[in-house]
Amino acid sequence: MFAFKKAQRLLKKNDFDFVFESAKKITTDDFIFLFRENKLGYARLGLALSKKMIAKAHDRNRIKRLLRESFRHTNLPAVDIIILARPGLAKKTNLGINTKLNKTWEKLASCYGK
């Protein structure tokens, strides 16, 4: 069974603060990706999808599932990543979101030469 392992998640405030204090940024129409290299040897993901940006819980949950699954299938360098949602994301289709994510993962990987 495939899973998004606990080790691949940013869970604690210190983990999020580590990224926020000196993050690099990639901005798209739908997302803001904040990322910072870590010393763990694998990538970790944190999600910050607020009610203000995505009002309905089922939309937030759908988008979180898409983000986690896309992250899980992507081979990334050792970075901690926080994804912030932008307004209007809930109106996008799953295919549109996945297409945008794949382009962004490639851009992020190219920042670290992987």
Curated annotation (Swiss-Prot):
Keywords: Endonuclease, Hydrolase, Nuclease, RNA-binding, tRNA processing. Its EC number is 3.1.26.5. It is an enzyme of class 3 (hydrolase). The keyword Membrane does not apply. GO terms for biological process: tRNA 5'-leader removal. It catalyses: Endonucleolytic cleavage of RNA, removing 5'-extranucleotides from tRNA precursor. Gene3D superfamilies: 3.30.230.10. InterPro entries: Ribosomal_Su5_D2-typ_SF, Ribsml_uS5_D2-typ_fold_subgr, RNase_P, RNase_P_CS. Consists of a catalytic RNA component (M1 or rnpB) and a protein subunit. Belongs to the RnpA family. RNaseP catalyzes the removal of the 5'-leader sequence from pre-tRNA to produce the mature 5'-terminus. It can also cleave other RNA substrates such as 4.5S RNA. The protein component plays an auxiliary but essential role in vivo by binding to the 5'-leader sequence and broadening the substrate specificity of the ribozyme. This is Ribonuclease P protein component. It comes from Legionella pneumophila (strain Corby).
